[in-house]
């Protein structure tokens, strides 16, 4: 897979996590406690601008799923993906960085849109 283009056109701020499978993978399924490798692009809903992308660093993000190493929207949204899959996550600020945001990077109260590619799963 290659770096996705993330569009916010026609997207409204959700109150709950929105999960859209763009491609269902055929590899191992990601479960809580697994170490996962995820390539992603993240944009803010308000301006559609990219604030982060693992693709630009040439290396996926590795984390343990479901233990709070990432924002809650990711812990919930990546679970159930299969290796080789691509999923769009529309994450309300309550499941991201909340009213404070990340100064200079993400505005307070911002809805975040991620397109995530699950590239690896390692068992517990």
Please report, for each region that a protein language model flagged, where it lies by residue.
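Cross-family detector of peptidyl-prolyl cis-trans isomerase
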Residues: 1-124
């Amino acid at each position: 897979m290659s770096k996705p283009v993330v569009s916010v056109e026609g997207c409204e701020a959700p109150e709950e996590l929105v999960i859209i499978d763009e491609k269902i993978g055929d590899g191992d399924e990601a479960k809580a406690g697994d170490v996962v490798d995820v390539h992603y692009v993240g944009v803010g809903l308000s301006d559609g601008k990219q604030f982060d992308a693992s693709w630009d660093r040439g290396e996926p993000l590795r984390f343990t799923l479901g233990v709070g190493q990432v924002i809650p929207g990711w812990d919930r949204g990546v679970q159930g993906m299969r290796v080789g899959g691509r999923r769009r996550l529309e994450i309300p600020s309550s499941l991201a960085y909340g009213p404070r945001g990340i100064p200079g990077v993400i505005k307070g109260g911002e809805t975040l849109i991620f397109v995530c590619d699950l590239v690896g799963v390692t068992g517990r």
